[in-house]
Amino acid sequence: MKVRNSLKSLRSRHRNNRLVRRKGRVYVINKVQRRFKARQG
């Protein structure tokens, strides 16, 4: 999982990317290509 300041550019890299908020953190998850996981921090 990558940790990035801004997730907007990571989200646009694949059309299945989803922006999710969990426990106060913002994540990008992808059920199809799992290598696109990222967390904002």
Curated annotation (Swiss-Prot):
PROSITE patterns registered for this protein in UniProt: RIBOSOMAL_L36
Keyword match Ribosomal protein: yes
SUPFAM superfamilies, sorted: Ribosomal protein L36
UniProt entry tagged with the keyword rRNA processing: no
InterPro entries reported for this sequence: Ribosomal_bL36, Ribosomal_bL36_sp, Ribosomal_L36_bact
One GO cellular component, as annotated: ribosome
GO terms assigned for molecular function: structural constituent of ribosome
GO terms for biological process, alphabetical: translation
Keywords: Ribonucleoprotein, Ribosomal protein
Family indicated by similarity: Belongs to the bacterial ribosomal protein bL36 family.
PANTHER family (alphabetical): 50S RIBOSOMAL PROTEIN L36 2 (PTHR47781), LARGE RIBOSOMAL SUBUNIT PROTEIN BL36B (PTHR47781:SF1)
NCBIfam families attached to this UniProt entry: PRK00831.1, rpmJ_bact
Listed name of the protein: Large ribosomal subunit protein bL36
Protein source organism: Rhodopseudomonas palustris (strain BisA53)
